[in-house]
C-alpha cells in the first residue's frame, strides 16, 4: 500500500470480495482506458506503461484481499494471478506491435509460450515469467522485426516506472538457452 496507495480505492467496491478476475473484462477496461488517454493525446509509451502497472497492481491487490479473507483457495489465487499475467502479456504484445516502427504487416504472427509457474497456471505473488517467443512468418524481414518486438515487449514488462514494475522475465528456457536467439521461427 505504501508503494501503490491508489489500490486502496479498490476496497470501496462492495462486490470486490465476491468477484473473480475476468480476463475479458480486464482487457476491455485497458482498451477503454487507453482510448481515453488517446482522446486527449496522452497515450505515449510512458502513459501506457503506467496504465498497465496501475491496472496490474489493482488486480493483484484485489486478489490478495480475497486471498486474505479466505474467499479464494490457493489454486484459485494461482489461477487468477496466471490469468492476469496472460492478459498483461496479450495486451502488452498487441500494444508493442502497434508501436513497432518497422513492422511489415497489420497483425503479427507471433506467440508467447509460457513455461514454469505461468505455463502450469501456478503463478504466485512476485513470480517471474518463464517465457519463450516464436513466430510463423515467411517474410524475409520477419526475424529482425520479431526480435525488435521481443526486445520492446521485455522492456515494457520489466522496466520500472513511477508506478513500479510488472514482472521479471526469464528467457533462459529458449531452444538454445541463454546464448540463443530471443525469438525463434516455427520452422527452426
Regions found by a protein language model. Give the residues of each.
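Non-catalytic regulatory/linker segments of enzymes
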Residues: 2-188
Amino acid at each position: 500500500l505504501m508503494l501503490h496507495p491508489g489500490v486502496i480505492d479498490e476496497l470501496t467496491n462492495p462486490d470486490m470480495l465476491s468477484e473473480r478476475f475476468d480476463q475479458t473484462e480486464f482487457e476491455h477496461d485497458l482498451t477503454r482506458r487507453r482510448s481515453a488517454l488517446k482522446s486527449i493525446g496522452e497515450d505515449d509509451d510512458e502513459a501506457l506503461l503506467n496504465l498497465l502497472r496501475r491496472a496490474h497492481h489493482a488486480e493483484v491487490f484485489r486478489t490478495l484481499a480475497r486471498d486474505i479473507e479466505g474467499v479464494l483457495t490457493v489454486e484459485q489465487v494461482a489461477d487468477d494471478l496466471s490469468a492476469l499475467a496472460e492478459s498483461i502479456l496479450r495486451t502488452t504484445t498487441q500494444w508493442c506491435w502497434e508501436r513497432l516502427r518497422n513492422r511489415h504487416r497489420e497483425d503479427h504472427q507471433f506467440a508467447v509460450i509460457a513455461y514454469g509457474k505461468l505455463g502450469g497456471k501456478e503463478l504466485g505473488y512476485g513470480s517471474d515469467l518463464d517465457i519463450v517467443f516464436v513466430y510463423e512468418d515467411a517474410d524475409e524481414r520477419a526475424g529482425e522485426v520479431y526480435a525488435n518486438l521481443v526486445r520492446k515487449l521485455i522492456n515494457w514488462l520489466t522496466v520500472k516506472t513511477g508506478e513500479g514494475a510488472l514482472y521479471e522475465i526469464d528467457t533462459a528456457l529458449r531452444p538454445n538457452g541463454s546464448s540463443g536467439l530471443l525469438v525463434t521461427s516455427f520452422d527452426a
